[in-house]
Structures are given as structure tokens and as C-alpha cells.
Amino acid sequence: MSTSAVRVEALAVDVTFTEHNLRVVLADGCEISAPLEWFPRLKAATPEKRTNWRLIGPGVGVHWEEVDEDISVESLLAA
């Protein structure tokens, strides 16, 4: 009997911030939280600039144009 692994891609659907953390909500309802310390440009950005984000493709990552920052969901899951 053979089995094969099914790769399910985690996709972001929303981004929020707390005072010290970036929080990414995934399509399956899971949430990833990471300290802003890991992302110096986001940490230094104003709250208004942090909320000006867009998804990369179908949600494989998040892009902040004004902050010049891109973060992939895969990198957050690997951390």
C-alpha cells in the first residue's frame, strides 16, 4: 500500500498588531504571532503605516509598501 503526503499551503487572510506583536490570521482560522522585534522596519513604522498592508498573491505573504517589508507565511511558520 502506498501513501502520499498532501501538502496544504497556509494562506494569510488578515493581519493585526498588538503593542509588541505581529499577528497573522490564516485561512484555516489558526493565528501566528511573532514579536515586532523580529521586524525592525515594522517596529519603527507608525500604526497607520503598519495597517497599510496587502496580501501577496492568494495570501502566501504580506507586503507593506510604505515600510518596504515583505513577510511570508512560510517564514513565520518556520520560526
Language-model segments: residues:
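Motif-centric detector for short Cys/His coordination patterns
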Residues: 1-79
